[in-house]
């Protein structure tokens, strides 16, 4: 069993618990508590990014386990239920946050490894990201409600990952979205 700690707890707490990567993958995929799913995904991604930075500095290629990508795919498949949550859960830790976790900050390594992970996810989940992008088109005309905002955010996140592939077809999707945008979120 994998404990899902502090479920439903609303106060800021900094609890250290040594979960294995397998535990974090399990929580990211199956935990019923949305915050714990997000937190597990962030911790798991940070673990792989920090290891990737060590590899990068040593001149080795970064390795990102398939189980992590499958967990991302699971969250993406579940995205129609709550696109705003999926957007948060599928986002990687920021370069600034990664730097805060390091003793010696290496901006080039952080940027390179984070981008490598984004490309790895995009390559492995290309079809799923494309499907999510196509099915989350916000209703026309523009509506400023929470559900529509979540759909726009998820759609843009998917497009951001897909742009890592540097394919003409994906660039065309990006340009078409910009050209037809009726709101600032979709044009940025």
Question: Language-model segments: what does each one mean?
Answer:
Residues 1-188:
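Long, ordered, helix-rich scaffold segments
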């Amino acid at each position: 069993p994998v404990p899902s700690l502090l479920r439903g707890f609303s106060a800021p707490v900094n609890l250290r618990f040594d979960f294995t990567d397998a535990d974090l993958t399990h929580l990211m995929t199956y935990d019923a508590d949305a915050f714990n799913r997000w937190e597990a995904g962030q911790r798991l991604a940070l673990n792989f990014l920090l290891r990737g930075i060590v590899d990068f500095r040593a001149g080795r290629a970064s390795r990102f386990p398939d189980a992590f990508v499958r967990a991302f795919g699971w969250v993406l498949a579940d995205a129609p239920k709550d696109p705003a949550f999926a957007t948060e859960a599928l986002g990687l830790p920021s370069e600034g946050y990664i730097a805060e976790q390091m003793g010696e900050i290496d901006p080039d390594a952080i940027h390179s490894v984070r981008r490598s992970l984004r490309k790895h996810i995009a390559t492995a989940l290309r079809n799923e990201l494309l499907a999510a992008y196509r099915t989350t088109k916000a209703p026309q005309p523009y509506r400023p409600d929470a559900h529509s905002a979540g759909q726009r955010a998820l759609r843009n996140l998917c497009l951001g990952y897909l742009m890592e592939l540097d394919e003409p077809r994906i660039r065309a999707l990006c340009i078409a979205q910009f050209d037809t945008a009726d709101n600032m979120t979709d044009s940025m």
